[in-house]
């Protein structure tokens, strides 16, 4: 074994050495580790690791083998049994190593050598691997740093570019601003110089004026001295003349004496005693003369007395009717005027007219021709209570009328005098008067019912308290007038057949003499029982409730007729209704505060609970609290808090009072005794807690207490059981005075109320504060309970201790249904509280408009007399819808509306101070409202009002007069002016009483200026949103100076003129319904009315007129419908009147040219109109204006060719020879007084007609430049303003969208037609002027558009397309083939479909479903374009090389293979896109993105021109054009084209020399025609002319050099700079469009 092991071991150990050593040496020789890559190093590492693992295995195997060999070698030959062998072993082991020889060829040495070598190799490899890994890490770090640096470099470069761009932009802006500032500085300097020059001139003028004043002063002093001298001379002369007169008089007396002596001597000689009669006769005549004078002076005195007494309503003729009226008045019941009364009447005569004038100023004119109709319930208002004008006040007269019946017996034949104007006396007597007489009587009765009686009869009624301190000045006169008119009107009254009056007790003592009134059913049919505590539902309108009687005076006891109960099915007794005493202490009221006392508020107990399973706390509170207008106050034992709820703005103070209730436990209280008070009727307290339940059911005490519990709880079963018991007092009241009926009514338990009423409970039982069950139900809003209580004759006018009636409480809490029921029952609206408040005060104090309207209008007739409405009503009815209040008269008198409380505040004061504008509006509708009534602090309602209420009060009696602009009468068929309107309403003038004539003039001027600027603005802006300058003219040139005259109604007026009356009085007196402004027209030699009628700017019309006057020969040409004929005729009219004003006779001659109009006819026209005169004849003084219309129907060169020279030079130096009918020829010439105007309905001239162009002055009316460009927009805007009566609607209004759509259709149609190369189909704005403007009916506009499309647009487009597609275009020829081919028909249908969908239906304001319904009405609405696509692809083979070379746009390629269909037009955002030529011809911005599409289409057009010149098929061109319109995806929305008009770009192609121009802001410059046609000499001339006329501001054409992205913004800024438009530049664009496209995307 040793031999085997020895022989094998060297071989085994050599193999790993060779395996490990050979690769190491090879690696040294073949490659270097430093040059290896990362992947190679990794592979080498993996190989080495495999080698190491293999060597480890070998080492382990060798170690095991070594152990075996060692043991074999050392111990193999010994035996343990042999000791000597053991000794030998130990010996050998103990010997030194050097001495020992290897037993065999020692494999350990070999193994150790191998291991040492491997260890060395492993260490070297590990060092090399570590070095390689470190180098790799370093390389990775360097790569990352390099990438970061590159990114940072890119960012910095981009930032640098941005900063450069920004800096350039800033520099450009700064340069621009510097230029602007320098320009402004120059302007300011120039202005300063002008101002300084003006100042110097003013100084010179001032000094000159001072010198003149000094001279005038000297002259005046001299003249004064001269006057003094002359006066002294006159005095001297006068004294001399007086002395002479005295001498003459003395001489005359001497002569008279001598004459008398001579007469006496003669008479003595003739007769003896005849001298005495002759002496007495002069004395008698003298006496008679004196008597006549005294009669003349006494007569008017007598008449004036009678007039003041009896004839106030007939002030126009006071002297004629005196003798008749004085004796008749006493017979009618008026007391005769005694001597003392006469004196009083005469003394008060001076106050009559002021009183009448004051009434007129408030709308209460006495001398009204058509009296207003009062409502029938006017009688019912007053008869329930006393009239304040004739009976004592409720609160101020404790002892009024101690006996009422006895005085009445003495006056049974006639009513007492004071009752003639008292509603209490007259209302029951004549309840069904003629409405006109009733209205007139109502005016006199209601205007001031507080006036004391002045008829001298003081036994009928004591003097009343005067509520109005400001109405004492005219009491006497108004009282006399009221008596007189009321007496006269009472003759015409008679009792009516229907509707008997409600029984009442007037003060005259006619008690119980009225017929009974039937009462209908009071239960609401089908009315469900309302849960306790919940607000009852609103019932249907009652068929009619009875009118229960009420005492007119609190002291009277009225005995009702028992026949009332017999006519009804409801239990009623003949009771004596006693009202509460009226002598109550007057309470103090602070403004906006209420002093609440215990005596002025009833106590309403909460509902007790008997159900043990229901938690009682707040069982009825939440619903009640939320259903009321005001909130009931929270209660404390000793403090009563006032109402302060969400809906009430009252902030009253609180007043502590002694409480009679001790809030201990529920068992210690009596049921029904509550601390819930009806505090000034303000509402229910949300924090009420039922007193009978504090954690458990209330103990059932005595039967009366249990009865109240059941009534408050609404337990009908228990209540009915208790009522069936005998001996139970159902009227028992607790210590607060609350009965069971009170508790049931307060909590709204209708069934309980009915049970108690059927059990004969006292319906008017009041608590200790005087509140009845009706008061509680009305305050809580339980209208069914109110209805029941009224049916059982509850006192509807019962006043509590504080004076609160059920109506007052219902109004205070805004319970409409309760108010309606009470008013229908005839409650008194005029009862005042202790503080002097009426129900109207209560309704206004809470801001409840519905309650106020019910109080004022309920019971009024449905429709009043519209002709006789008060002036205040007319204002509000202008702005409000038709409603009951607006068409009927209020039923409350003016005294009640103007009644002031203890502080002097009226309802208007309260509404104005709290900002309740709606309530104030309702009050202002009452004609008798006195807004100037002052309170005790001398403040009016306006003084205490909020801002919006102040505005309302200022406009109270304002008149709204429409202001209209008139342009005079427009002749029918006036040359395209059929759609023009004569008058337009621009606004409504608000004329107040205090408006002066200066303010009126300024308002008219400002309204005109605002209107002119509004209709000429760009957007839909309201007049309030725009800040106008009243001195600047509008963009159309009109201003206030354009006005010719103004008429106020039918009265002429000029700005600045003043009348004696104020504008308000003047408008009312003259019944002026409108103010009409007439603009200056051609009759005055002005064109303002023409500007307003046609919306052509005034400056342009004046420029046209100047051209006519300067050049004498002007032709207006443009597309059909451009108003050429109208412009020419109006200019001729203006020129005619100017010449006539200068003293020259003038005549206008019109001639319509047709195809048969020959040159001979034109010669005859010129000769007959004396425009062409023989050379031998001298020109006449007469001016001749000739208008040749429709020149497009004839050849200009043939018609006017022989007249070109003579027309250009109006003198004998340019004669022309014409043959007459007899064969003789004669020379003629055009004289200087001849003007020639022509009209051509054609967009451009062609062929031989261009020869005529240079001999005339041409005015081109282009559709895409002014005046035609903005004419339609201004015209339709004015139409909308007129339709909305002067108001500009908001831009989102459907009418504005419809008008904008019609405007966009016109522009888009012309853009598409221009792109298709069919200028003869272009349309002027005339056809679109008739666009209907109907608010809310956009369908009408779409129908009108369909008719216009079918009748005008589609036939013109069809003719133009066939004209282009049939033959090669020749100038002047527009012929069409009679039988178009199928391809031509397809092209026409495709063109119509594309135009319809891209230009007409695009942007339609209708919804998609509605639009689809109307699409069928349009001719050519649905046509599939697959034919176009196939046709286009087939014709692709015939394209020339140049076409394929240039037409490389990707949008052309993508469009060639698309086949969209237009059966249902796609109007979505990604559907239809506008085409580029639209953008070319319609107002685009010159951005680089648009430059691309411009170049594409320019290349298209240029190559189209090349193909035409090569004789290619025009159908293919049209198909290409149409398809590019369909498939253009890169263009902006077509609806945005019409938004800007500053940058118009057009392209012109004339022959082989195309001109690319962009006209910027040049509305008047004619440009070359947009037409693709072969080159001709005439077109070359035209092109050169147009090229010279275009502005220098053409777009800069883009270079063919590549453009980086960062310069796009810079290029867009430079596009407005001028550059040349040479041919080479154009070719560069076309050839390099492909290079530009990548930079555009």
Curated annotation (Swiss-Prot):
Pfam families found in the cross-reference section: AAA_lid_NAV1, Ank, Ank_2, CortBP2
Superkingdom of the organism of origin: Eukaryota
Primary location group: cytoplasm
ANK repeats: 702-732, 736-765, 769-798, 802-831, 835-864, 903-933
UniProt-listed InterPro entries: Ankyrin_rpt, Ankyrin_rpt-contain_sf, Cortactin-Actin_Reg, Cortactin-binding_p2_N
Biased composition annotated in UniProt, kind: Basic and acidic residues: 1580-1590
Signal sequence coordinates: none
Keyword Repeat: yes
Chain positions found as Phosphoserine: 1512
Subcellular location(s) per record: Cytoplasm, Cell cortex; Cell projection, Dendritic spine
Disulfide bonds: none
Coiled coil regions, renumbered to chain: 119-276
Residue stretches of biased makeup (Pro residues): 497-506
Region (Disordered): 1-27, 361-433, 446-472, 488-588, 1442-1468, 1544-1641
Sequence ranges of Low complexity compositional bias: 1612-1626
Keyword Coiled coil among UniProt keywords: yes
Compositionally biased intervals (Polar residues): 385-405, 576-586, 1551-1562, 1570-1579
Keywords, sorted A to Z: ANK repeat, Cell projection, Coiled coil, Cytoplasm, Methylation, Phosphoprotein, Repeat, Synapse
Matches recorded under PANTHER family: CTTNBP2 N-TERMINAL-LIKE PROTEIN, FILAMIN/GPBP-INTERACTING PROTEIN
Self-association state and partner proteins as the record states: Interacts with CTTN/cortactin SH3 domain. Interacts with STRN, STRN4/zinedin and MOB4/phocein; this interactions mediate the association with the STRIPAK core complex and may regulate dendritic spine distribution of the STRIPAK complex in hippocampal neurons. Activation of glutamate receptors weakens the interaction with STRN and STRN4.
Protein purpose: Regulates the dendritic spine distribution of CTTN/cortactin in hippocampal neurons, and thus controls dendritic spinogenesis and dendritic spine maintenance. Associates with the striatin-interacting phosphatase and kinase (STRIPAK) core complex to regulate dendritic spine distribution of the STRIPAK complex in hippocampal neurons.
Protein name per its UniProtKB record: Cortactin-binding protein 2
GN (gene name): CTTNBP2
